[in-house]
């Protein structure tokens, strides 16, 4: 039986808008408008931005597209500032008081030491789930025409030279929409290689700034984490699905 983690700081597990990155927070009302329009119109197209300068401005101000020479919002792989650095520090303090374990049910090639919050700290899991629903769900509607209603896992993961000597291509079988948040950036190596669908060329998503998140369709996008050669790469990973 897993003993639940006792929080070092109670407010770390209270969902509040002040935990979001300031660059993102002010644009969420616009993204909610866009998500509603995407639902009503069965998806948005570039032409929808022409009559809504604020829509285009918000997307370009917040979302970085990877695998495209200029912003088209079609590659399916994006990054954006999600959580503010001060809150990341609170999360790292909690991590320091917990223990990482590998998931024996995963393929040995992709096993990474992790802390699954549903098992180890349900209150923190629920807080982060609320922040995901508030900030990321509208982006999923805009960028993928999808609604990730169900959270399959929220976990801290740690990549080190000992456990990532080489990467392995894989899909996130239990995640339609995957979000990976950088908790640290003082290691050497890391980043993520991505193979887009169809005949697209492989590209790299570099190590992101602390608090920034990579967003992609985990179950449909081949990817692997590049080796960490020095230090530890700490991540916060969300796996969400359209169905239970």
Q: Residues of each region from the PLM?
A:
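Non-heme Fe(II)/2-oxoglutarate
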Residues: 51-146
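Fe(II)/2-oxoglutarate
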Residues: 1-75
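Catalytic core of non-heme Fe(II) oxygenases with the double-stranded beta-helix
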Residues: 141-244
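Charged, low-complexity, helix/coiled-coil-prone segments
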Residues: 25-40, 64-85, 115-124, 151-160, ...
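Short low-complexity stretches enriched in small and charged residues
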Residues: 32-39, 45-46, 71, 106-112, ...
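Contiguous hydrophobic segments
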Residues: 17-26, 38-42, 46-48, 99, ...
């Amino acid at each position: 039986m897993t003993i639940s983690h006792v929080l070092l700081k109670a407010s770390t597990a209270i969902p509040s808008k002040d935990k979001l990155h300031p660059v993102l927070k002010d644009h969420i009302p616009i993204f909610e408008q866009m998500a509603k329009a995407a639902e009503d119109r069965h998806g948005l197209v570039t032409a929808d931005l022409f009559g809504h300068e604020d829509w285009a401005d918000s997307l370009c101000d917040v979302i970085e597209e990877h695998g495209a020479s200029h912003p088209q919002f079609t590659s399916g792989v994006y990054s954006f500032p999600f959580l503010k650095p001060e809150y990341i520090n609170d999360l790292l303090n909690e991590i320091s008081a917990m223990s990482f374990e590998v998931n024996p049910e995963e393929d040995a090639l992709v096993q990474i030491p992790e802390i699954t919050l549903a098992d180890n700290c349900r209150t923190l899991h629920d807080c982060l789930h609320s922040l995901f629903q508030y900030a990321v769900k509208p982006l999923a509607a805009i960028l993928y025409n999808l609604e990730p209603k169900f959270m399959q896992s929220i976990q801290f993961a740690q990549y080190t030279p000992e456990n990532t000597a080489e990467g392995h291509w894989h899909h996130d079988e239990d995640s339609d929409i995957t979000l990976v948040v950088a908790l640290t950036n003082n290691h050497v190596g890391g980043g993520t290689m991505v193979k887009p669908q169809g005949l697209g060329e492989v590209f790299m998503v570099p190590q992101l700034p602390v608090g920034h998140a990579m967003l992609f369709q985990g179950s449909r996008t081949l990817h692997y984490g590049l080796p960490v050669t020095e230090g530890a790469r700490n991540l916060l990973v969300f796996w969400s699905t359209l169905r239970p």
